[in-house]
Amino acid sequence: MGVYTFVCRNNGGEWTAKQHSGEIEASAATPYELQRRLVAAASAADSRYGVQSSFSMVTPSSAVFQVIVGAVGGGAMMVSGGGGGGAAASGGAAAEAPKEEKKEEEKEESDDDMGFSLFD
């Protein structure tokens, strides 16, 4: 799986993008066309796998765009659409799942406890 992160800027009506830690660059007149070009460039290495992307505006003239090649389909992977934090490209150890807190079951109150019944 490959993760490509791009910093996008709008200068004088033209959108440009540079890969955060790499050599891929692209430019286009609209953010949509820029995204299409970046997805094509990132998936050129291996187009057999699925591609997932996320475009987040930071300011009216800048954005962050992330392309994940080889993403698992069917909603098994989630990509943040507007928050911070990037995905790690290395296969590090998975974080431990938080321990579930024990919840005490609340007893349902019956009609008898209130002194009346539905059928009285």
Curated annotation (Swiss-Prot):
The keyword Phosphoprotein applies. It comes from the Eukaryota. Keywords: Phosphoprotein, Ribonucleoprotein, Ribosomal protein. GO terms for cellular component: cytosolic large ribosomal subunit. Phosphorylated. GO terms for molecular function: protein-containing complex binding; structural constituent of ribosome. One of its GO terms (biological process) is translational elongation. InterPro entries: Ribosomal_P1/P2, RPP3. Residues 83-120 are annotated as: Disordered. Plays an important role in the elongation step of protein synthesis. PANTHER family: 60S ACIDIC RIBOSOMAL PROTEIN P3-1-RELATED, LARGE RIBOSOMAL SUBUNIT PROTEIN P3Y-RELATED. Belongs to the eukaryotic ribosomal protein P1/P2 family. This is Large ribosomal subunit protein P3. It comes from Zea mays (Maize). The gene is RPP3A.
